[in-house]
Design a protein with these regions (language model features):
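N-terminal glycine-/charge-rich "phosphate-binding" loop or analogous flexible N-terminal tail
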Residues: 1-41
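Short, well-ordered beta-strand segments
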Residues: 3-4, 62, 84, 136
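Glycine/Thr-rich phosphate-binding loops of Rossmann-like dinucleotide-binding domains
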Residues: 13-14, 52-53, 71, 145-146
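Short secondary-structure boundary/capping segments
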Residues: 18, 34-35, 73-75, 126-128
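A short, aliphatic-rich alpha-helical micro-motif
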Residues: 36-38, 55, 130
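Phosphate/diphosphate ligand-binding glycine-rich loop within oxidoreductases
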Residues: 41-113
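A short, basic/flexible loop-to-alpha-helix module at the beginning of a structural domain
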Residues: 118-128
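Rossmann-like dinucleotide/phosphate-binding beta-alpha-beta segment
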Residues: 126-154
Length: 154
């Protein structure tokens, strides 16, 4: 089996994959060519859609993204190719990042950080409290759910 990995990996991760799939051919390429796609039985990662992924021999496309909308359009993949995504993998990390960015924005932390770096302690806009605020979450998949769960504390 020929496995094409175009997901962003650290060197140690690449080495582990090669060691685990010792009986298979593993090609690791951040920018796969059409020739790489043409020869792959399995693709791990999100290959560019300008490549022809509609290959009869392609058994599976294992995306490293939570969404797969662009890959399910008619003609992108062969009907026999299995498609998976990483839905559920990013909810906690991204939701905590979103909450951190909300607090940073609402409390003008960027302004304060820049002033602190420059040694200036100038009065600045107070900012807005998150407590009892309304938040609109667009999309209620795993990431939206995890954001809502954390915002409930406010």
């Amino acid at each position: 089996m020929k496995i094409l990995v175009c997901a962003p990996l650290q060197e140690a991760e690449s080495k582990k994959i090669q060691e685990y799939f010792i009986n298979d051919t593993v090609v690791i390429s951040r920018r796969p060519t059409q020739e790489d796609i043409d020869q792959a039985d399995v693709i791990v990662g999100n290959p560019h859609l300008d490549l022809n992924l509609n290959q009869e021999h392609l058994q599976a496309l294992l995306l490293n993204s939570a969404g797969s909308d662009q890959y399910i359009k008619e003609g992108i993949l062969n009907k026999t190719t299995k498609l998976t995504n990483a839905s559920g993998s990013y909810g906690i990390a991204i939701s905590e990042h979103v909450i951190g960015m909300m607090i940073t924005f609402c409390k003008n932390l960027k302004t304060y950080a820049l002033q602190m770096k420059e040694g200036n302690w100038l009065p600045s806009k107070q900012g807005k409290e998150i407590y009892h605020s309304r938040v609109c979450i667009v999309g209620y998949g795993d990431i939206g759910y995890e954001i809502a769960k954390r915002l409930k504390a406010f």
